[in-house]
Amino acid sequence: MAMPDVSLRQLLEAGVHFGHNTRRWNPRMAPFLFGVRNQVHIIDLQQTVPMLERALREIRNVTAGGGRVLFVGTKRAAAEHVAYAAKRCGQYYVNHRWLGGMLTNWKTITNSIRKLRQMEETLAGDGQGLTKKEMLNLMRERDKLDRALGGIKEMGGLPDILFIIDTNKEKLAVEEANKLGIPVVAVLDSNSNPEGVTYPIPGNDDAIRAITLYCDLVANAVLDGISAEMAASGADIGALEELPAEAVDEDAEAHA
């Protein structure tokens, strides 16, 4: 598996160049804007291509070194695609709501994950000793915790890099990563604030096709990094590729 190529045509077809109405913009994004068309800011894709490639290389390098990638996108347009991409490459995600302290108070989050596991074990054992009402309440509580923490349940520690869709909505995630010195890769629309983003990717962060493209490219970069790590350790790359293929099939069925 090779690093994914990024072409200008790919980005154009996905609508990556369309920013927001000129009334809704952040002046800090001015260096990344090409101009205005029909009162809509147009993002300079000549800059996006190399910046996207740089971000993908960094993600690839992180996973080649055995690092963890956390995908973050909680708005409706991104949530499903973020989860699907993270699962496809064996990484982690937050797609429901960013809980305060998710990174900076990891110990408390770990306790909540432990609580989630205990609930799952109880329910897997048919909830012996519980009344029907207690079972229903436990299931509701489990579902609520799983929506918030299910995507990081297996992470086992802090991530080594974040990939974020919409930094305006995920401002808290950026701030927490900055406090801990965790690098941030993020898509920045014309109304975004680039502050605190280590590897910015100027582009539309609302269009489904654009979001899907970013997520696919990042997932492929992760898989390329994992392949490189396995090759360096002398592991069987064929075995590595077989496992994700099965996982992809399962996810694709659920995604359909």
Curated annotation (Swiss-Prot):
InterPro entries: Ribosomal_uS2, Ribosomal_uS2_bac/mit/plastid, Ribosomal_uS2_CS, Ribosomal_uS2_flav_dom_sf. Signal peptide: none annotated. This is Small ribosomal subunit protein uS2. SUPFAM superfamilies: Ribosomal protein S2 (SSF52313). It comes from Acidiphilium cryptum (strain JF-5). The lineage of its organism: Bacteria, Pseudomonadati, Pseudomonadota, Alphaproteobacteria, Acetobacterales. GO terms for molecular function: structural constituent of ribosome. Coiled coil: none annotated. Belongs to the universal ribosomal protein uS2 family. One of its GO terms (cellular component) is cytosolic small ribosomal subunit. GO terms for biological process: translation. Keywords: Ribonucleoprotein, Ribosomal protein. It holds the Pfam family Ribosomal_S2.
